[in-house]
Amino acid sequence: MPQLNPGPWFAILVFSWLVFLTIIPTKILSHISPNEPTPVSAEKHKTESWDWPW
């Protein structure tokens, strides 16, 4: 019975886990945080306050 021969199946198992542990986490992490947070600038806005003309 060839299905009891662990040679080819073990290689397939190791290769599939290698794919899961190297490629899949990078794909998942890129979707979890797609954008880097932009730093908040400490500059004051250049708009000036104005009063209502009444």
UniProtKB/Swiss-Prot annotation:
The chain crosses the membrane at residues 4-24. The keyword Ion transport applies. It is found in: Mitochondrion membrane. Its main location: mitochondrion. InterPro entries: ATP8_metazoa (IPR001421), ATPase_protein_8 (IPR050635). Residues 42-54 have a biased composition (Basic and acidic residues). It holds the Pfam family ATP-synt_8. Component of the ATP synthase complex composed at least of ATP5F1A/subunit alpha, ATP5F1B/subunit beta, ATP5MC1/subunit c (homooctomer), MT-ATP6/subunit a, MT-ATP8/subunit 8, ATP5ME/subunit e, ATP5MF/subunit f, ATP5MG/subunit g, ATP5MK/subunit k, ATP5MJ/subunit j, ATP5F1C/subunit gamma, ATP5F1D/subunit delta, ATP5F1E/subunit epsilon, ATP5PF/subunit F6, ATP5PB/subunit b, ATP5PD/subunit d, ATP5PO/subunit OSCP. Subunit 8, of the mitochondrial membrane ATP synthase complex (F(1)F(0) ATP synthase or Complex V) that produces ATP from ADP in the presence of a proton gradient across the membrane which is generated by electron transport complexes of the respiratory chain. ATP synthase complex consist of a soluble F(1) head domain - the catalytic core - and a membrane F(1) domain - the membrane proton channel. These two domains are linked by a central stalk rotating inside the F(1) region and a stationary peripheral stalk. Belongs to the ATPase protein 8 family. This is ATP synthase F(0) complex subunit 8. It comes from Carassius auratus.
